[in-house]
């Protein structure tokens, strides 16, 4: 679900906005068009578009936006953007070019939030300062498009696998267009204590995902 604030940097800090309930298209079966219809019939306010669903859809991004609007749905988030942060400079430039293409696609979709997953690539380095700086740079690019970045810790992330670590990077990056995405699956699968979530400023929690799955051993122990 989206915990939104205005993504327009020209208007300054936004006040509280109502929570909007959404569902990720990866959670539904069928074509993207069928998934949009199902989400609308179930009473959701919006959808999170999964990249794989868009790639296989016969509609263009702009047509997907119109179809969603016709059904009374907002495209609240586009996901996932993988293996971005904590990388060498030459790889960062490539990743920023990749991000620019995503922002252009999101503009056609009408999505204002990009979900960035913690890096799982062997190319990622264990350097929190570098990761925070690179997230700041990505958020600055997002600002230029009137968009924002929701950073999510994957339970299998190479160096960032907890919401606490993700929040430390977001706080260090200190950019208004950068916030955190909290996912119950990734938090509970590693049995992390969720009590520290109350210490994260509400305006920096950009997205909340509630997901269920069989209990598995995610730490290899």
Regions found by a protein language model. Give the residues of each.
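Glycine-enriched alpha-helix->loop->beta-strand junction motifs that scaffold or abut catalytic
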Residues: 43-45, 110, 173-179, 201-206
């Amino acid at each position: 679900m989206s915990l939104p604030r205005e993504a327009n940097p020209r208007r300054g800090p936004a006040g509280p906005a109502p929570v909007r309930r959404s569902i990720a298209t990866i959670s539904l079966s069928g074509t993207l068009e069928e998934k949009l219809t199902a989400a609308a019939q179930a009473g959701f306010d919006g959808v999170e578009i999964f990249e794989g669903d868009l790639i296989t859809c016969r509609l263009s991004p702009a047509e997907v936006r119109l179809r969603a609007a016709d059904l009374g749905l907002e495209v609240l988030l586009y996901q996932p953007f993988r293996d971005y942060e904590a990388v060498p400079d030459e790889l960062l430039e490539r990743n920023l070019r990749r991000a620019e293409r995503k922002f252009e696609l999101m503009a056609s979709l009408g999505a204002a939030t990009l979900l960035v997953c913690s890096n799982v690539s062997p190319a990622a380095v264990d350097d929190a300062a570098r990761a925070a700086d690179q997230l700041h740079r990505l958020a600055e690019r997002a600002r230029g498009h009137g968009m924002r970045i929701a950073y999510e810790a994957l339970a299998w992330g190479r160096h960032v696998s907890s919401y606490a670590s993700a929040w430390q990077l977001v706080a260090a990056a200190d950019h208004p267009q950068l916030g955190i995405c909290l996912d119950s699956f990734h938090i509970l699968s590693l049995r992390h204590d969720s009590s520290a979530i109350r210490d994260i400023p509400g305006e920096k929690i950009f997205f909340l995902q509630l997901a269920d799955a069989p209990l598995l051993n995610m730490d290899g122990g």
